[in-house]
Amino acid sequence: RRRPKGERQPTKAPNIPNRTSIPDRPAEADGKRFGDFEMDLIVDAYGHAILVLLERMTGFVMMEKLPYGKRAKPLSKTVVRMLYAYRKYLKTITTDNGSEFAAHLDITAGLRIKGLDDVTVYFADSYCSWQKGAVENINKLIRQYIPKKSNFNDFTDLYIKNVAKKLNLRPRKKLGFSNPKTEFFKQIANFALAS
């Protein structure tokens, strides 16, 4: 049968091997405990991408321009490099079903610490971006500095890092008007004291 003009073509379920769906994510990963991250890409019209990692409790954001675009293997190495210093605090990472996140098992392996539970990458349901709402909201704030129609090649790596720095120093109501950077490192200090 012919599809009426403007009606959406049904999409196939994402083909990401060994993916763990968001309903399997522990209830504690609700944004109230430290160490639960969300991950996303913002992409320009030219195929360039910026990786965005966000710690849910504190709103602490990390960003990096990806010179290889949306390729899964190099992206997984970048995620591991960016989170490696914080791996003992990691609990979960939630993302969408983009093929760029297909190497999620490489992320888990790269962040593994013997004797501790592995960090699991959970995948949101299709068309449910609200299931990773914290990173979607930060993406809107990022667009204040990097407008939608811009070419990411026009922005230096230093500029991207400075955008993250500005966002991490911006006071947030949910943090009692503290900022994400202060709260993120306060949580790390508390963890060190408890150890």
Model-flagged regions — what are they?
Residues 1-51:
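Mobile-element integrase/transposase regions
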Residues 43-46, 63-87:
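Active-site beta-loop-alpha junctions of metal-dependent nucleic acid enzymes
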Residues 55-56:
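Short, acidic, Ser/Thr-enriched surface-loop or helix-capping motifs
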Residues 60, 89-90, 123-124:
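Polytopic alpha-helical membrane proteins, predominantly small-molecule transporters/carriers
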Residues 60-64, 148:
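Short small-residue beta-strand/loop micro-motif enriched in glycine and branched aliphatics
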Residues 70, 86, 90-92, 97, ...:
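Conserved, well-structured core segments that form or line functional sites
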Residues 95-97, 102-105, 111, 120-144, ...:
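RNase H-like two-metal-ion nuclease catalytic core shared by retroviral integrases
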Residues 148-195:
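C-terminal domain-tail junction helix/linker
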